[in-house]
Structures are given as structure tokens and as C-alpha cells.
Amino acid sequence: MTAKPDPLIHPITRLSICGLLAAGADWVEFAALRDAAGISDSVLSKQSRVLEDAGYVEVRKGAVGRRPRTWFRLTADGRRAVQGHLAWLAQLEEAVAAAPEPMTGGGDHPGGVPGKSSPGVTRRH
């Protein structure tokens, strides 16, 4: 597994879909995935098609009684992509946590607010 961002699943909607599929049962029904992701039918249809075209998601269509149903599951490639993307996000989180605190205050110096002067300092124009 390589820790690198995956531009295909980086958009939050696709990342949510993949994350829910990775954490869910083998097959997840359309309505359950839509509700868990908090998105509309059309958004799930469009974004799942992108993921399916990339080989990250498998789609199965069928019926329960007379009602048509659609189920999704993450493929092995999709699972690897999610794991790599999450590893990259974890590395990014570690880097941010290890970064020094930014300087605060006014003035025209590094860490100051651009265009703001420190109290008691007159700026000439």
C-alpha cells in the first residue's frame, strides 16, 4: 500500500461513499448508502458511476419482489485506493500536528497580519 492521495476518491462525496463501503457489509443497498452518506439519489448515482468506471466499486442490480434494487461493494482495487488515501491523510495529519505553532501578533513581519501595524506604530504612506 502506497500512502498517496487518490484524486479520484479525494472529493468528499466519493471519499464518504468509499469509506462507508469499506466499513460496511459485503454489499450495501442503494438507499442505505444514500442515507448514510447524506446525499441525494442523483448524487449517489453519478458518483458511484465514476467509481464504477474506475474499477473501485462494483454495482449489482436486481429486484426484491417487484421492486428494483441496486447494491454496491468496494472492489479490491477500491479498497487499496481507500487504504492508500487514508494513509496519506494520516501522514498529513501527523505533519500538521508536528508543525510549529504560527507566530501571532500584528506588524509587518513574518507571522503578523499583512497590512496591520503593531499597536503604537505609525505607518508612513
Give names to the regions the model predicted.
Residues 31, 40-43, 74-79, 94-97:
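Juxtamembrane helix-loop transition sites at the ends of transmembrane segments
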Residues 48-49:
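Short, hydrophobic-biased segments on the C-terminal half of alpha helices
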Residues 55:
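Glycine-centered, phosphate/nucleic-acid-interacting loop/turn motifs that mediate DNA/RNA or nucleotide
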Residues 64-86:
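Basic, amphipathic "hinge/linker" alpha-helix immediately C-terminal to the N-terminal HTH DNA-binding motif
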